[in-house]
Structures are given as structure tokens and as C-alpha cells.
Amino acid sequence: MTRIAIGGFQHESHSFAPRPTAWMDFIKPGGFPPLQHAATLLDTLRPTAAPCAGAIAVAEAEGVEIAPLAWAFANPAGPVTREAFERITALIIAALSDAMDAGPLDGVYLELHGAMVSED
């Protein structure tokens, strides 16, 4: 059976915005669900309009085993703080490591936003 990992990290950063995007902005983002860990990612994102929801639907329809990672979204604002960036990427990397420990992966689907900027 094909096995893929699914996760994401989305933010539209505006370098001219006066307020940086902090960790709490991903915990309580408004509009989209808050930060999701592997255990809640699939059930929470399935009914949304997030791109991951489409990837989940197709993977499940095709009989692909999904290894959920972590998923984060914050509303548009200033650059993502170093703390938030490092914490979220660490969650994704740790979940990916756990998924690989559980068995081989055939692919990784990461929902990313091309306009994200971090402080560093």
C-alpha cells in the first residue's frame, strides 16, 4: 500500500506590517482551524477548504495510507517570529521522524504558502 505523510505550514507574510506573527497567532488564527497535531489533523481538516483537505480526500479515495504530520495557519501579518517558525518546523520534523519510524513513506505532501517570511 502506498503511504504518504501530509502536513502544512501556511502564512502570508507582509514585511511592511508592524506586528510580527507569533506562536499564538497559529494557536488561535481565526478563519482556519488552529495548529493541528498528527492525532487531530485528518478529522479537523477533512471538512475544510484547506488544500490539505483535497489531498486527504484523494489519498483516502485511492486507498493511500496517510501519515499525518502537523499543520499550522495564521492570518496575514508581519514576518513569522523565529520562535514560532522553529516550534512549528520542529513539530513537523518530529512527526515526520515518527512516521518514518513506523514504516517507509512513498511521499510527503506539505501544504506551504510561498509568501511566508520569517524574522531570520
Question: What is each of the regions a protein language model found here?
Answer:
Residues 24-28, 64-66, 97-104:
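Short hydrophobic/aromatic-rich motifs at helix boundaries and adjacent loops
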